[in-house]
Swiss-Prot record:
SUPFAM superfamilies: L-aspartase-like
Cellular compartments per GO CC: cytosol
Protein's cellular compartments: Cytoplasm
Any one Gene Ontology molecular-function term assigned to this protein's record: argininosuccinate lyase activity
Pathway(s) of this molecule: Amino-acid biosynthesis; L-arginine biosynthesis; L-arginine from L-ornithine and carbamoyl phosphate: step 3/3
Protein name: Argininosuccinate lyase
PANTHER family attached to this UniProt entry: ARGININOSUCCINATE LYASE (PTHR43814:SF1)
Native source species: Citrifermentans bemidjiense (strain ATCC BAA-1014 / DSM 16622 / JCM 12645 / Bem) (Geobacter bemidjiensis)
Family annotation (PROSITE patterns): FUMARATE_LYASES
Short name of one Pfam family: ASL_C2
Signal peptide: none
UniProt EC number: 4.3.2.1
Keywords (A to Z) from UniProt: Amino-acid biosynthesis, Arginine biosynthesis, Cytoplasm, Lyase
Length: 458
């Protein structure tokens, strides 16, 4: 018999010491202790209810598991690599404490459905937490949008000045992205919150278990419908990592803008000293380390998704030892996403903006050129012809080192006789912004309404 192994009856030689260390997962799956114990208590309770094991044994099992939980949380539990994983560590300790009753706990289940349960329980709780952290960032964004309503900045395409927009409109763009990110987390929760326990190793169990009762005890919405699928797939974990990658891409784009905007060349925003660091050699430096790290950690989260996808891509049904490698990418993604969301929310809430600098930048780069084209369209000129006229006007301005607002009426009329005195009312920054009143536009009235709508939906 392989010494000290709960599965060792079939073996005549002990496990190689290095193999034991190589195959053990306790160093990282021990974080599932609470879920493992909770699942075992529910399983034991069901076994007693169904008359599969004596009620007295159930009482001993539940009491023993609660004691083990207290020991783990007090730091008094010694995890053993020789026992491989969190399941075997807890079960072995339970049997030491209560004897044969502990050996009955595993009746009607396998580690295959047990670990699937633990991961689902763990991810279910974390999905709720991640959604709460998203809400914190959404609140910070709404705060900035509301506090700075009316501030005009340049909108960019290709990182070139395009059209003037409200800073609040820009902030609310990230609000929309984060709303979708939260919705993806909530959708993932629906598919995660189903009970796999009862699937056994792959084919189910011969015991008259009550899976629906266990699902009720553990607050699951239902049970999985195919035992093979229950232990074979980790698509719920992949879905979470995919949603997290999209979320992190949004944070990375936001980070990139804050990094740019905080440079001396832009000076649109100033990040709080609390979220920046200095240089070891250049005393004048104030480095935006937090957004840079968030941008960098996006690659880490994306890598975790690829790791999970690659892990699962060629596995035959049902369980394979490869699947032990699912936990570290999942755990790391959870930790990274929560940390990034928390620090980002605090940073956004505390950042200061520079309205004058934004307005000055918005006025440069011929940002109201499209408004001139729209003006000409309203005068009866087809848009493509209007586009050509404004393009020639811009070239004239470049050649004469001037901007659109500096043109006189006479100069305007060199390009079109339909241009009149009212052109000057159409090319101010305020007029440009407020003219975009359609749903989703940057007009003040629209942005104010979207902020109010966002606050109601929190």
């Amino acid at each position: 018999m392989s010494k000290d192994k709960l599965w060792g009856g079939r073996f005549t030689q002990p496990t190689d010491k290095f193999v034991e260390e190589f195959t053990a997962s306790i160093n990282f799956d021990k974080r599932l202790y609470h879920q493992d114990i909770r699942g075992s208590i529910a399983h034991a309770t069901m076994l007693g209810k169904q008359g599969i094991i004596p009620v007295a044994d159930v009482e001993s099992i539940v009491s023993g598991l609660k004691t083990i939980l207290e020991q783990i949380e007090a730091g008094e539990f010694d995890f053993s690599v020789s026992l491989e994983d969190i399941h075997m560590n807890i079960e072995a300790r339970l049997s030491e404490k209560i004897g044969d009753a502990g050996k009955r706990l595993h009746t009607g289940r396998s580690r295959n459905d047990q670990v699937a349960l633990d991961i689902r329980l763990y991810l279910r709780d974390e999905l709720v937490e991640v959604s709460a952290y998203i809400d914190l960032l959404i609140d910070a964004i709404i705060h900035q949008a509301e506090e700075n309503l009316g501030v005009i900045m340049p909108g960019f395409t290709h990182l070139q000045t395009a059209q003037p927009i409200l800073f609040s409109h820009h902030m609310m763009a990230y609000h929309e992205m984060l709303k979708r990110d939260k919705a993806r987390m909530e959708d993932c929760l629906k598919r995660t919150n189903v009970l796999p326990l009862g699937a056994g190793a792959l084919a189910g169990t011969t015991f008259p278990i009550d899976r629906e009762y266990v699902a009720e005890l553990l607050d699951f919405d239902g049970v999985t419908r195919n035992s093979l699928d229950s232990v074979s797939d980790r698509d719920f974990a992949m879905e979470f990592c995919a949603a997290s990658s999209i979320l992190m891409v949004h944070l990375s784009r936001f980070s990139e803008e804050l990094i740019l905007w905080s440079t001396s060349e832009f000076k649109f925003v100033e990040l709080s000293d609390s979220f920046c660091t200095g240089s070891s050699i250049m005393p004048q430096k104030k480095n935006p380390d937090v957004p840079e790290l968030v941008r960098g950690k996006t690659g880490r989260v994306n890598g975790n998704l690829v790791a999970l996808l690659t892990l699962m891509k060629s596995l035959p049904l049902a369980y394979n030892k490869d699947m032990q490698e699912d936990k570290e990418p999942l755990f790391d993604t959870i930790d990274t996403v929560k940390g990034c969301l928390k620090v980002f929310a605090d940073m956004v809430r505390e950042m200061k903006i520079n309205p004058e600098r934004m307005k000055t930048a918005a006025a440069a780069g011929f940002s109201t050129a499209t408004d001139v084209a729209d003006y000409l369209v309203r005068k009866g000129i087809p848009f493509r012809d209007a586009h050509e006229i404004v393009g020639k006007t811009v070239r004239y301005c470049i050649e004469n080192e001037m901007d659109i607002p500096e043109l006189s009426l006479a100069e305007w009329q060199l390009f079109s006789g339909r241009i009149e005195e009212d052109i000057f009312e159409s090319i101010t920054l305020q007029a440009s912004v407020n003219a975009r009143r359609a749903t989703g536009g940057t007009a003040l009235e629209r942005v104010r309404a979207e902020i109010a709508r966002a606050k109601e939906g929190r």
